[in-house]
Amino acid sequence: MISVKVPASSANLGAGFDCMGVALKLYNIIEVEEIEKGLEITSSPDDPSIAKDENNLVFKAMKVVFNEVGWYPKGLRINLINEIPLTRGLGSSAACISGGIYAANLLCGGKLSEEEMIFLAAKMEGHPDNSTPAMIGGLVFAVLEENKVNYIKFVVPNRLKFAVFIPDFQLSTEYARNILPKYIEFKDAVFNVGRAALFASAITTGNYDLLPAATQDRLHQPYRKNLIPDFDKIVNLSLEFGAKGAFLSGAGPSIIALIDENYDSFEQNVKLALSSLELKSKWDLMILEADNSGATVFSVQSSSSFKR
């Protein structure tokens, strides 16, 4: 059996639409082994929305690798242990795709390079902002080209933490993408380009005082926040208690605030305030660090029939 741990991720980070993302210390575990025949899939918790057949996203990702290397197992047993909440904007699909590709490559004897796996994952998901940090960890600036992903990985210091607000409702990424306009004004593009560059500079230099300005956005948040009635209240609350910027995590509905000090008092004060505010939804708060490793293998007892 091969066991792989793959992190959650947050994409966009404000102004970096479809090109910036960070891996977070919240994990799914994928256990796979070759069996004599058939496909067996189990999951914990046993969520009925997770396909247990060939439509399962982890299996689909593994099949991409098998097609690429030209080898197929006789059968597969897949066990999924999921901590990453589904359709909350925390990269659950990217974890399935990147983790499935990573696990399948191990089953195939590591035939694919890291660069090849990064490309296959981004191509399958359609953009690299979640899949690349899920694969390699850290904070990633990435662009999907025709046959490769151009990216830069930045190792995030422990000083910068991520206050993740997770609501009690789901939001389809497809739906949240479909509400975006087909065209934007030139001035809004300029607004985002400048702030995305400022964000990269603030992160790499440690000048976190620039983050409140650098996390502003005009490409997606003004449209998507209407799907999240508490968005402005959560963002304003975070800034009030010292966050260095707050933004939608991916397409939402989760919201992330960046904090670089007074972590315990931030958590206590925000939780107390959440209990007293009139909100449309119930929100859970988790303080997470960045994961700088990405997908990792922590157990290999392979009985794969792959011939090296």
From Swiss-Prot:
Binding site for ATP: P85, L86, T87, R88, G89, L90, G91, S92, S93, A94, A95
EC identifiers of the protein: 2.7.1.39
Gene3D superfamilies membership: 3.30.230.10, GHMP kinase, C-terminal domain
GO annotation (BP), single: threonine biosynthetic process
Molecular-function annotations in GO: ATP binding; homoserine kinase activity
Pathway: Amino-acid biosynthesis; L-threonine biosynthesis; L-threonine from L-aspartate: step 4/5
Function: Catalyzes the ATP-dependent phosphorylation of L-homoserine to L-homoserine phosphate.
Annotated protein name in UniProt: Homoserine kinase
Organism field: Caldicellulosiruptor saccharolyticus (strain ATCC 43494 / DSM 8903 / Tp8T 6331)
Organism phylogeny: Bacteria, Bacillati, Bacillota, Bacillota incertae sedis, Caldicellulosiruptorales
